[in-house]
Regions:
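SAM-dependent transferase fold signal centered on methyltransferase-like domains
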Residues: 1-280
């Protein structure tokens, strides 16, 4: 599958573009126009542009004729995803690899497998980089607001962990041995006493709302041990230092380390920063 963004000035050539792409990449089955994200779940707005059927390329196929559910590989794991119903971005692999590096270092500090929480997990790509490492992860909390994402997440977890994960009819958050998974508003996680003070690592992949959710989720962390919070944050170029201080002030330990690493410009006045918080 290939996603393309088509600028208006070249739209008149889209048929030629699609055929050229598919002829150059014979393994590509489907080409979709990516018209950005939409809705509360930030699902991609996709339009079919080209479909390979029995070796022949059909341009502008009907939506009913295409299957957008695919399997992708990351860190040696196969991830079931469907960009038409659940957010997934392969461009975040660098962040996910860094998560794994931080997790390995944290395990050494703690001296045992770590408990990982991903309250905006989607189909689970961040977890894919962690669960295949020997003795790295013990317990998992994986939640999201999108029921379709949770359905695919549970499929992925069953394969990765080799265990049964039961699903309620509404896919609500529930525990299956060492895995909590399901539909849950991250704002309400701290209302569950079972989840409080339990987690050693948390992933907050919500760039526009990282600072909003951080204080709501800190109570889930096990403050008796070192812990790490990883995520991304969009902020103004001239407010990075201020944001750094604000994040530091929210930590329970004054010796915590906050790293804000600007990765790229998000707009002319804002940066997309990688965030690492280490609580000693």
């Amino acid at each position: 599958m290939m996603l393309l963004k088509i600028e208006e000035e070249v739209r008149i050539y889209e048929e030629q573009i699609v055929k050229s792409k598919m002829e150059s990449h014979p393994h590509i089955r489907l080409v979709l126009e990516d018209r950005g994200v939409k809705g509360d779940f930030r699902v991609r707005d996709l339009r079919p542009m080209g479909l390979r059927i029995n070796g022949r390329i059909k341009v502008n196929p009907s939506l009913d004729a295409v299957q957008t559910r695919v399997e992708v590989k990351e860190s040696g794991q196969t991830i079931i995803c469907d960009p038409a119903v659940a957010y997934y971005s392969s461009r975040l692999q660098t962040e996910r690899i860094q998560n794994a590096i931080e997790a390995e270092e944290l395990r050494v500090k703690i001296g045992s497998p770590i408990a990982v929480a991903d309250p905006f997990c989607g189909v689970g790509p961040a977890l894919a980089h962690l669960v295949n490492r020997p003795n790295l992860v013990g317990q998992i909390l994986a939640s999201d607001l999108n029921p379709e994402a949770i359905s695919m997440l549970n499929e992925n977890l069953r394969r990765w962990r080799g265990c049964d994960i039961e699903e309620s009819s509404q896919r609500k958050l529930q525990r299956n041995k060492d895995v909590w998974s399901g539909v849950q508003d991250a704002r309400e996680l701290a209302e569950n006493p079972e989840l409080l003070g339990r987690w050693n690592m948390m992933i907050i992949n919500l760039p526009h709302s990282f600072a909003e959710f951080l204080p709501l989720l800190i109570p889930l962390m096990d403050a008796t041990k070192p812990f790490v919070i990883r995520g991304r944050l969009v902020c103004r170029h001239d407010e990075i230092t201020e944001n750094h201080q604000q994040l530091l002030e929210q930590m329970p330990n004054s010796n915590a380390q906050v790293v804000l690493d600007p990765r790229r410009d998000y707009s002319p006045i804002t940066s997309l920063c990688s965030v690492t918080i280490r609580n000693p």
